[in-house]
Amino acid sequence: MGNSYAGQLKTTRFEEVLHNSIEASLRSNNLVPRPIFSQLYLEAEQQLAALEGGSRVDNEEEEEEGEGGLETNGPPNPFQLHPLPEGCCTTDGFCQAGKDLRLVSISNEPMDVPAGFLLVGVKSPSLPDHLLVCAVDKRFLPDDNGHNALLGFSGNCVGCGKKGFCYFTEFSNHINLKLTTQPKKQKHLKYYLVRNAQGTLTKGPLICWKGSEFRSRQIPASTCSSSLFPALESTAAFPSEPVPGTNPSILMGAQQAGPASDHPSLNAAMGPAVFNGKDSPKCQQLAKNNLLALPRPSALGILSNSGPPKKRHKGWSPESPSAPDGGCPQGGGNRAKYESAGMSCVPQVGLVGPASVTFPVVASGEPVSVPDNLLKICKAKPVIFKGHGNFPYLCGNLNDVVVSPLLYTCYQNSQSVSRAYEQYGASAIQPISEEMQLLLTVYYLVQLAADQVPLMEDLEQIFLRSWRESHLTEIRQYQQAPPQPFPPAPSAAAPVTSAQLPWLASLAASSCNDSVHVIECAYSLAEGLSEMFRLLVEGKLAKTNYVVIICACRSAAIDSCIAVTGKYQARILSESLLTPAEYQKEVNYELVTGKVDSLGAFFSTLCPEGDIDILLDKFHQENQGHISSSLAASSVTKAASLDVSGTPVCTSYNLEPHSIRPFQLAVAQKLLSHVCSIADSSTQNLDLGSFEKVDFLICIPPSEVTYQQTLLHVWHSGVLLELGLKKEHMTKQRVEQYVLKLDTEAQTKFKAFLQNSFQNPHTLFVLIHDHAHWDLVSSTVHNLYSQSDPSVGLVDRLLNCREVKEAPNIVTLHVTSFPYALQTQHTLISPYNEIHWPASCSNGVDLYHENKKYFGLSEFIESTLSGHSLPLLRYDSSFEAMVTALGKRFPRLHSAVIRTFVLVQHYAAALMAVSGLPQMKNYTSVETLEITQNLLNSPKQCPCGHGLMVLLRVPCSPLAVVAYERLAHVRARLALEEHFEIILGSPSSGVTVGKHFVKQLRMWQKIEDVEWRPQTYLELEGLPCILIFSGMDPHGESLPRSLRYCDLRLINSSCLVRTALEQELGLAAYFVSNEVPLEKGARNEALESDAEKLSSTDNEDEELGTEGSTSEKRSPMKRERSRSHDSASSSLSSKASGSALGGESSAQPTALPQGEHARSPQPRGPAEEGRAPGEKQRPRASQGPPSAISRHSPGPTPQPDCSLRTGQRSVQVSVTSSCSQLSSSSGSSSSSVAPAAGTWVLQASQCSLTKACRQPPIVFLPKLVYDMVVSTDSSGLPKAASLLPSPSVMWASSFRPLLSKTMTSTEQSLYYRQWTVPRPSHMDYGNRAEGRVDGFHPRRLLLSGPPQIGKTGAYLQFLSVLSRMLVRLTEVDVYDEEEININLREESDWHYLQLSDPWPDLELFKKLPFDYIIHDPKYEDASLICSHYQGIKSEDRGMSRKPEDLYVRRQTARMRLSKYAAYNTYHHCEQCHQYMGFHPRYQLYESTLHAFAFSYSMLGEEIQLHFIIPKSKEHHFVFSQPGGQLESMRLPLVTDKSHEYIKSPTFTPTTGRHEHGLFNLYHAMDGASHLHVLVVKEYEMAIYKKYWPNHIMLVLPSIFNSAGVGAAHFLIKELSYHNLELERNRQEELGIKPQDIWPFIVISDDSCVMWNVVDVNSAGERSREFSWSERNVSLKHIMQHIEAAPDIMHYALLGLRKWSSKTRASEVQEPFSRCHVHNFIILNVDLTQNVQYNQNRFLCDDVDFNLRVHSAGLLLCRFNRFSVMKKQIVVGGHRSFHITSKVSDNSAAVVPAQYICAPDSKHTFLAAPAQLLLEKFLQHHSHLFFPLSLKNHDHPVLSVDCYLNLGSQISVCYVSSRPHSLNISCSDLLFSGLLLYLCDSFVGASFLKKFHFLKGATLCVICQDRSSLRQTVVRLELEDEWQFRLRDEFQTANAREDRPLFFLTGRHI
């Protein structure tokens, strides 16, 4: 029979496979059993079994539930109403009794609503605009997720008061709904009704019936704000069970999955509610929250309901999340916290973790009574986790039990894990079944050690891996194949049936020695819970830690729950459900009510001499007047090395100077780089160019020590001086303006900061949020709690206020060591704006050399696990044993109280033992004794009395006060007040130190101020002290280098989140000297310890007779580590532990192993185990507890290598025998510790600070935390890193990968950004609702780095470099060079003597001689131009520069940009946005391309130019009508007088400077209208147009792409003249004379940045005595002044002096000079019509043009009192031309000597224009052509019609061949050479014969080709006087197609 039908298991195979599976999983380190159950089914019937057994869909999933359960799936029948009673009212909106039920009518009337009922709005088809009011039993209404409504109905009529309607049909008749279909409560009960602040009944949230259409509605804030807070205070608790979905960004519906945008936003002022059964407006107002109305998706989709009729009042689907029940509040059900102020979208994950608030769970069925005195009997409150299905009511002694829904939430999340594969179309992949979930949970609990607590993260990963493995084939199939339109048939989703589950679970639990007990129920969970309570009361579960209750009676589903009954686990779990506020409240209550008195009384019974206080008093009386002999030698008075003055000297005490370390500088530069990248982005979110200076505000947590510490950092960093504050103004009050303590007074100071930022738009304000993870509570929570705690949500209210977010000049920098809570899916900080502290090395190479090495958490763990040294992380086994024992004795006391009292007792006993009461050694632990001995003896090792600091961390402030008072009392009784200080460190108060110690500190730190007091912990350097550090969280306080012990045994070990753990351990972070390796130092410490201590430990092992001692003896390193860390020899033998254990009747054997196993310093990983001989190294499981922990479980299955494990103890030891063994060893232990005391402490006679520099502090941890920290996963990542990152966030999904040790900080950030979401109380919770797609704030950055590593110094350095950069942005490097050749200036009798003339007098100016000498320093290496006035000596010329130094060595000065500066493309400001074409209100300016052609005879062809004209600039041009062809550029009239525009068009030729060219003349022109044209090459047109979209551009023809600046100048001038002619013709038609058209243009370099004017104060008109000053003015001012000159039309060329700080008075004394002009010229194109620029030139074309203009008899005038500043631009310009070889593989540099070659040679040709090669060659090697001219300034080279630079050693004489030209008299000059460059027909033989040459002078003729060369020689009859040789012909090194230039040289006969 049994195996004959489909789906039945094969019994024999089943038992065999299951047995092997369970045994293998128990032996394995892997927590996740292989999914073997799929093997157990007959494959042929797999699908059918799956559909029948595993794919359960409750009938209740269907919404169409009918009256009486008679409905079928067919179409609904028309509903017939029962006949109405005669005489009753039938009016719509009234009941049959005639009472008005309409909401609008009775909204203000009082209503009698029984307990458990809610007022509901009924929708009537006949009254669509009205709601009818009725009262309904809320058990028949759905919970917030649309589930758990009992079938049926129970309601009352609020009109007539009739009660007891049991059928909705009957009720709908009574209220006259008049329906044509069968009444359904889901259809007609539509809204909850709530009362607003005025007490008026109003429509509230939609009732979320499952499957109904979901609508996002919100109650107006005014509706609920008034009564929300009182309800929270009294009864409401926020449920932590969210919608059962994994990803909050996806709204899962029963029939659809909507996008994230459909997610309803949580109303900030509205919270979910829990009812206590009383109907009050306050409760009703909180009735429902729309966010919870998310429909629950079916695991298998919507299936047809073919099941049997439904039974009335049957519960909803067990998949439904439970809603709080009003009738039976569970224990702790009233707890609420900030995290719960809004509804969680995603469940809590940690069974252990903060914010795991306990909430009532919905119940069904018969109630279960909780026995009285359960806590007294069990010694701990059992914690019951709801699992699957329905959970019964609890009643009776509810205070002794805790119920939590967290496990249910975990189950629900893992049920939906397959949704991640929906993108592959994998609807066939089923979630893990409920049966498998429960079985895996049992497996997990079985493998937990006795001292382990279950973690939800572990369980989630087990489910995930099991699911992955069981569906690996399907997953791969869908990942590799495209989505299929029709998915295959479902595979088996539940290989284990509910009927088999209890037996399988019992079988799995059978091997764990009853640690896990399984109870099977026949009917309901109530039966199993009652059974569990009975067993607990009878003491039959004394050895049981977990009870699994399973009810599999229902055909398609299971009910389950898990109760934690182990005393250790239950205590930790129940305490972890308390919020921090509740935790403090609980401790306060126990202290205030005197509950702890029993604990104190117990301690007083331990001492054999009686109460410790009596012993202290006795000791005090005996030793009054003198100090104990053991401490008589004061550390200060002992013999020591003295300095000259007789003061003791200590070489180890040197306070480190405040200096910036390489790491900090690197981080500061990274921060600066990120700020610059924000500014450089196209989003225009930060305009660095508009800021002139930096200001800042540092916001810190409300800690006085942190506040003072930050003030000191700011003071010593010098940042305020860097920001411009004068040294004399540096006062403490001034520094305090920059640091804001976020307390109740912060708002005023912050408002002043905002006001300051608003008033100073040109100041960049950096808002630094230090310790940014501290307060992340949303300001909406403040709205709820503002009356009770005004500081709630303060950070959000200040730093996230609208003013900060919108201010364009505020950058917010969050700084934290624990950034995880700021890295969620809703974060405001872009991942690109995160800056992580850099790693110290890469690939083994130090990136930044530092003399100190940072020692943080990872280094602590690494050193502890490595085994190379004494462990720095330790736990105190005897302390933990004592706490565990006392926890059982005092179950009603919080463990924090017990731990604090035990630790204080240990410290007191240790102090007494060290002070001369050796018998007290038995009442402390070795760890505490070590701390105390080193604390008291360290001052003896130093001549100055320097000692060490002991940090005692007591998070709970009231307990810290208790500890302080007790230790101070003991210290006073022992007369140790001057030996060490006890400091109570509290965030709210500063540092208080006794006068004696203040005096010592002043002496050590050489402080003369008698009023000085230490205000930070850093100032306690070297002070022997115990710092009792209180506060729930550290607030960024730094600790001194003298910190030697970090005692964290009292931290809240139940609060297992990553931030909390790392924050506490961060207190020990340290910088150690890089000079001494840590391991070496640690080994030295091991050598200092005494051998007797080690032997006593081994002897102890032999005494206890364990096999582990043999392996421990074999491994010296392990013995050493055991000695360093364990307290077995003394603490386990202490009478305190003995009596605590002995007096505990129900003490479990696990108490002993808990203390005994701790003899090993930590659970050993495989690397450590492998070091013991004979041990086999096994890989650590990637998930789950470390092997040492699993070894501690009671009665483990025997394993082969059990005997070889270090520290293994026999678990089966009776309490009596253990006590007797411990007692018997007390004598030997006390004697063994006594001699050890002298050698345990610091041995060498050296200051403790010497050792402190070499080694980090030793950290003592609670055992639970220790195990969490040192256990690692397969990648080596500490398990603590995988915990929930912060209490204010939640995991977004169970379906998430694990963190890996190989992840960088950036990868971890991306991980948290993907897998965490903020809780509703988190300030980022509502970020995605702001409508922005990305949600990132553009000016917000995050700096993260390990604690105590120097982040404060880094961001202060960042402020400094940012300030420097802003100053640098407002500064430019301008050329600052003295004019050259001043001593060669023409010394003529003629000077321009009218010093005060604003414009030159034409007649006077004409008489001035032209100064041929070039004075512009950029031409320092140019050939000197000679005239007959000069007598030049060779020494008058300075040393020429090397060619490569020409640019590098030019002198510059840094100048602050004025408001009249020209800018490049990086400048942005509001004023010139429109000018630039980037204004946000405008689109990029449209431009049109216009061709403009004109003929030029010299070029022999028509020139066609192109104008790019933006639409906004078309008014400057004339276009033909109607064709729109460009005709001309408009020119003003000479007679126009306007101060609003500049008449002269400005042309700026440019190349290679599209970003850096100074083309933004808006500010330079002071906003005046002007015409500015950029002249660009064709190939650069697009890039210039991109950067300057609103500028007119003149595009040169493509033939000029490789031309030099001469071509641009040539075309500008010719175009301008041609345009002048066109305008004259056009305006002549309008009656305007041609001479009235303005003929001037400006040709400006693209590097002109600012313009200046010289103000001269002279004593008289002709006096040479005067004073002058120079100031910056606008270009508009200069241009309008020059354009207003009366005789300006007579000048051909005007220019300005080049600015120099070295300008002499003589240079500005004369206002005008007739000389060369450069850089910025004003050209009269009319007068210079016949003078052209040379279009071929690259260099010196302006000098050449100046000489041409002068020789044509035209006037050049330089305004000496105007100057132009030229910016140094390192890109573009003439540097754009690179001379390279045409042979691509020739990488050798080309030198100028290679620029020419012999014709027809095999020379390598160059890729450069021939003209450039010519000019460059002549500049560097012209002496080869003119050897006689070298340094021969009396005999220059004659240069005809051109000026070419022949180098600084050769002088030239320029003459023009044009008729009537002005030339110098050359009759008395003998020339050393003749240069004929492309001579035209004006040069003839007769012209050359006028000049005389030295014998041997050389000639150089340059022509376009060889034939022209010969023709020129013949035409000029050169062979008459010059000798030519064939070898004297050359060409530029160009290929033939590049048209080389040809040279011919000759020698004068």
From Swiss-Prot:
The entry's cellular-component GO terms read:
extracellular exosome; membrane; nucleoplasm
**Keyword check for Protein transport:** no
Which residues form each disulfide bond in the chain? none
Superkingdom of this protein's organism: Eukaryota
Compartmental location: Membrane
Q: Family, per the entry? A: Belongs to the GREB1 family.
Write out the function statement from the record: May play a role in estrogen-stimulated cell proliferation. Acts as a regulator of hormone-dependent cancer growth in breast and prostate cancers.
Q: What is this protein called?
A: Protein GREB1
